[in-house]
């Protein structure tokens, strides 16, 4: 690995916040809709975006992949989508959880919350909770929409409806502010979703990315591809001095030297910036 490529890895990690901001803007480009109380419904809405971003957000450019996946599973006509499944596989094999670290709007939202000054807590002793997101994926995203249906065979998008805080943050709240009809229809479900959102906000201030670590089914899907994704993190054993700085700065609780392709790694690049010997870098297709 030549010095130019190592420098590029450090530069990429260094401007991660700007990349996250740009990705969030591109994912929600129709900003004037926030002031009109309506949702963009153009042709681009048939295309999924990489990160967790609610379809009902007034500014949303495309569809949320988790929402689209549930819509198909809960349909009375179709129970499988080659498009959405292929979308997951393509992005998973190409980028893995780099999407979580760089391209997801809700991931960036949590990063910003965690920057709020105050006492912070480690999640190292809470590692078993990381398996909760796989249970949520299986139960709320797949099984319930598939098996719990109404009289015409349609299932609800259970994760979006009962759990996802992004929906109330990006969709319900901004739409209700400018639409009296929506405000009058808000009830117990809205209150429940607001409670979840507030809980995630508070936890995000105290802990690093609790939603990503413990709840997000999209992160669970992408994590399955981390070991085989074309974009990954490489640790050069010949240069590593075993100082452990990479693992100390990893907020996803990954032992970087031993498991650089760990399912929890979001490719944020903190380890790349911390390494005193430039032994860690991004690698694409083995180069």
Predicted regions and their residues:
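Non-ligating segments of multi-cofactor redox enzymes
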Residues: 1-257, 263-287
